[in-house]
Amino acid sequence: MQLVSKIARTIGRVLKLNEDLIEAISLGHDIGHVPYGHFGEKILSELCEKNGIGKFHHNVQSIQFLDVIENCDLTLQVLDGILCHNGESHNKNLKPTGTLSWDSFQSKIEAIKGKEKKDPFPVTIEGCVVRIADTIAYLGRDLQDAIEVNLIPQDLNIIPKKCIELFEIKNWKEINWSVLDVLIKDVINNSYDQDSISFSDDVSMSIQEFYKFNMENIYNSEKLKKDSAKIRFMYTTLFEHFMADLDKENKESLIYPDMKELDWISSEYKKNTTRPEIVRDYIAGMTDRYFEFVFNKITIPDRVKRRYT
């Protein structure tokens, strides 16, 4: 989140854009991400569909948190930028698209949730900057992190040669810095005094190669998949447990003090939200660490302490 903000503000400052808008979009863009990343999102989406509330989308969930649950009264420009921030979908050129209206914004939400799985562009140039910063932020960082935790070897020869040359990578400890430096400068050079935010042709092609490498060696790694059954079990356990607690109105359940009874949650939300939606929002708002804490809390008996006299 902070890295995306720094990258986007750096680009926005040189291009003389609205840095406050860029900062607001950046800080809210990943609020909807769930425990255990993309695999966690996949499982939660399946559970949501099974319970009749449709697929889960982390960008739509960010809007759910900020505009529905907490009713933060953010501007339409900020909400639109957060909704359309998806930098994982690579685009060589990003140009503001659509009209700035609440009806248009709602149509974008429905398009994302629909069968065609559309991925709309932001309506502001600042939103486009954040989206391209999202692409820049994770590309080199994910690879360097994967090397640091021994997910892949410390061997630059396994990285596509074109990427090594273009990003001028000298050793694995400088991967992220090298990628950031080249991509930020390229975006600025190709976007200055333009009505869109763009990469050059060579850089855009290298990004696609880099992403393909990361997908095969990191995101779809067999080492990461080995715990997938455990994560699925944890998600299913939590979802079913809290659904049952809401059915029984079990006020001792964590979902009541953590979610349902919070005084800063919108009264409209409390009145109009279904049980599966409440459970979805509760789980989606957890960090990995709290997710694990809650799972242990509801599955492991409390230890009875012996008293010595």
Each model region followed by its residue ranges:
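Short active-site segment of divalent metal-dependent hydrolases/proteases
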Residues: 28, 32-36, 137
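A glycine- and small-aliphatic-rich helix-loop capping segment at beta-alpha/alpha-beta transitions
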Residues: 37-50
